[in-house]
């Protein structure tokens, strides 16, 4: 575990409780000598405002305030495996955002002291090549859904693992999931 010097805060924009927590967290973290990064547009604070991508590159810890969607949005941008993401559930879906809002101060105190455990999660790198040859790349923690367009009834798919062809088929879509995302489809 590396020393936590810079903490990034991402939050669900529409959630007033998230903005309130950011306003509380910025001075709380600064009092503990931490550099604080806040996602652009979340709330005006004394923290450094940046994009999620910049935050993912610079933070030693990311605190995600919202629900699973907020965490799933930042996770693929974090490319360094030593950067923990602390998911704080503010009342929505929270299967992977395990910390309740009223537990945040005590959990974050322990985390900053190095008293925490991480759980490694698999991510997928998805590459989609359209008929015109354009390639789109995505990293996902949960799942990727490839669906037919509004005009199509069915699409032709070639599925590869790395450079090896797995299968070809016609379908209305494809869902590729990590172990984290697979549980969502059983609900």
Regions found by a protein language model. Name each.
Residues 73, 77-91:
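Gly/Ser-rich helix-loop-strand patches that form or flank binding pockets
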Residues 39, 65, 86-88:
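Generic beta-sheet signal
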Residues 21-23, 75-78, 98-100, 187:
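Short amphipathic alpha-helical segments
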Residues 1-61, 102-117, 128-138:
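ATP/NTP phosphate-donor binding region
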Residues 93-172:
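Catalytic core of DAGKc-family lipid kinases
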Residues 18, 69-74, 183-187:
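Short glycine/serine/threonine-rich phosphate/pyrophosphate-binding segments
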Residues 173-178:
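AMP-binding/adenylate-forming core of the ANL superfamily
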